[in-house]
């Protein structure tokens, strides 16, 4: 990449700069492709944790640590990949399982505790917002 007719040395510097820029672009492209696969696997892993451990008192910080992402990236990429927020997915899973338990004969209190809720007021409010009726009304249906 040397320019033999330029004696000031700047031609060589310009060529080296162009080569470095090309190398940087290739590396960014390579890592971006790898990074997307890495992130996709991390988000799938986070979804698996939510699906299997929804009844535990999970935090976004704990999930992020376990999958190797920081909290902001986890929240951003989870929403982009799944269409749901991490907290929204956790709430939906808990409430769906609670409804199934109540409909199969469990008490509201047992379903609430099994699905990770510790306070009846919060459970009732989340349930009502999600389904449009209270958990006690689900038993009557």
Where are these regions (language model features)?
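Short helix-to-turn junction characteristic of helix-turn-helix DNA-binding domains
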Residues: 50-53, 101-105
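Short, basic/aromatic-rich helical patch in the C-terminal catalytic core of site-specific tyrosine
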Residues: 98
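Hydrophobic alpha-helical connector segments
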Residues: 107-110
